[in-house]
């Protein structure tokens, strides 16, 4: 809720918050308010808990016998894990760190790539964004086997639609590049996404000329 239509939306001033609402201090960016601090802690702790579980999954997958998986199950599981890890760190970066445009040398957030008790050393914002993008790029390689992207079967399209899939990862990657200030790669990734959807002939209907214009826009 807080990363979807709650806390983040109130910060963005997308809601007309009543003066008596518990959301009011958030809309005024009063992060030290006693009503706000538990929400902030919950976002931080819950998101890192999800990241810890993803790292447990990825660690077990690395040690697993791939022969026990059917078809492309291993690649999908590993790709989803990497992509979600990058995505969740990206969400935390946007809430708790400076933007690269403001100060790329400021400290980012701890980037956790394995499960354990030790807290990762905080790198700079720019370095942390590099970690995020690296996870998303690696996820793209694994998710190329995603049936939503690779298969022509309508059944598999429906089956994979609500998972973290190839298309979702490409869009998150484009957003990450854009937030970092790398417009060239952001547009390239978004253009690749548009063309892959058009060539697949499903999900969306977009004029190819419009897609070309968007992908070439600076």
Protein language model regions, located:
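Acidic, glycine-rich segments characteristic of secretory precursors and extracytoplasmic regions
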Residues: 1-9, 212-214
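Conserved, well-structured interaction surfaces
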Residues: 21-96, 123, 142-143
